[in-house]
Amino acid sequence: MNRKYFGTDGIRGTVGEAPITPDFVLRLAHAVGRVLRRTEARPTVLIGKDTRISGYMLESALESGFNSAGVDVVLLGPLPTPGVAYLTRAQRASLGVVISASHNPFADNGIKFFSAQGNKLNDEWEFEVEATLKEEPVWADSASLGKTRRLDDAAGRYIEFCKSTFAHDLTLKGLKIVVDGAHGAAYQIAPMVFHELGAEVIAIGCAPDGLNINDGVGATHPQALVNAVLANKADYGIALDGDADRLQMVDAQGRLFNGDEVLYLMVNERLSRGEKVPGTVGTLMTNMAVEVALKAKGVEFVRAKVGDRYILEELERRGWLLGGEGSGHMLALDKHTTGDGLISALQVLQACARSNQTLAQLLSEVVLFPQTLINVRLKPGQDWKNSAELAAQTKAAEIELGDSGRILIRASGTEPLLRVMVEARDAEQARACAERVADAVRS
């Protein structure tokens, strides 16, 4: 059974186009409120948002929808997605709601939900909400309508939580750190976290105007961070995305480190302290060099589908703690219930401080394999899955690469494209194999 509205990370789209319209969002909140009231007489919902101008409108629609179903609302204001997850759990709320489209431009927005435990909701819950949306609204009577209040110190509570995950015997004194907030939800919080731990902070991407979120800054545009680190002779650079659940880091030389490398560092740091790490979870896109390096240390490596939701599901199924993907979504389940860019950055800085080594030194054992990614546009109705030529070229590439590379073919979820990715120790070999497979799709 397919969901009509929910995707892999809530409901997302262009503001003013279905389903991101105020009337639909009001109906959505009303339906969610009715679902909550089936198991709880007087639920309380927390609502946080990023800095998009449309957040005001959607916040009002959510508030009205929940109140109309007899649900109380607590408004958190601009707050990172992981901050909403944390406060939902800490405040013993029934549900957390985030208004954000993450790394997308300002014209997009979305709604995602967290359970009372601070976890993303499962498919069954989403199916129940969509089924309730099909029903006629059942408005609460006047005496049962929900109320709304603000939690004025939401940001401060989350700042203290982030700092609590950093070793108390360590400090960031003496470090100059550039922090790029993507003009998003962490624009005030991120600089404060590192400043209060002792660092000299240079903030960029921390002046939102409602329209500039992720615009040339943040984790999806890391060149701004690289330039600022080099210009200010900083020790580190930290870039978040619009809702601060994603991380990219830069060292003093301007070298960019992606999520694959951060995952290896997080695992290796724990191994160096004598902790047992039976396994970790990456995705289909995680660089093979990370898998090889971790297996050499006796750490099992498992690939999930792309998306932090699927990484989390695999971690919970296996009882493991650490996972992540190259885009910068990192999970450390003994620190937080969801991916958190700030906490991930603190874990990296903690590893550097404990070892008295730089990022490059800590990652010297991992040399990422070159990757070639080719997007091939599919013809209308093209049956690529049953193409004999594609199957033959894919098999030939797999034989040629052996244990020194891999090939991944997957369809885009949003465009008529087939993505052909080849990874190998040799860049030219990766390119040649990818071209042959892509040509088979085009033929």
Swiss-Prot record:
Gene name tied to this protein: glmM
Magnesium listed as a keyword: yes
Native source species: Polaromonas naphthalenivorans (strain CJ2)
Keyword field contains Acyltransferase: no
Gene Ontology annotations of biological process type: carbohydrate metabolic process; peptidoglycan biosynthetic process; UDP-N-acetylglucosamine biosynthetic process
Gene Ontology CC annotations of this record: cytosol
Processing after translation: Activated by phosphorylation.
SUPFAM superfamilies: Phosphoglucomutase, C-terminal domain, Phosphoglucomutase, first 3 domains
Family named by the database record: Belongs to the phosphohexose mutase family.
E.C. code: 5.4.2.10
Catalytic reaction(s) noted: alpha-D-glucosamine 1-phosphate = D-glucosamine 6-phosphate
Cofactor names: Mg(2+)
Cofactor descriptive note: Binds 1 Mg(2+) ion per subunit.
Key words of the record: Isomerase, Magnesium, Metal-binding, Phosphoprotein
Native organism taxonomy: Bacteria, Pseudomonadati, Pseudomonadota, Betaproteobacteria, Burkholderiales
Cystine bridges: none
Name assigned to this protein: Phosphoglucosamine mutase
Chain positions recorded as Mg(2+) binding sites: S102, D241, D243, D245
Catalytic residues of the enzyme: S102
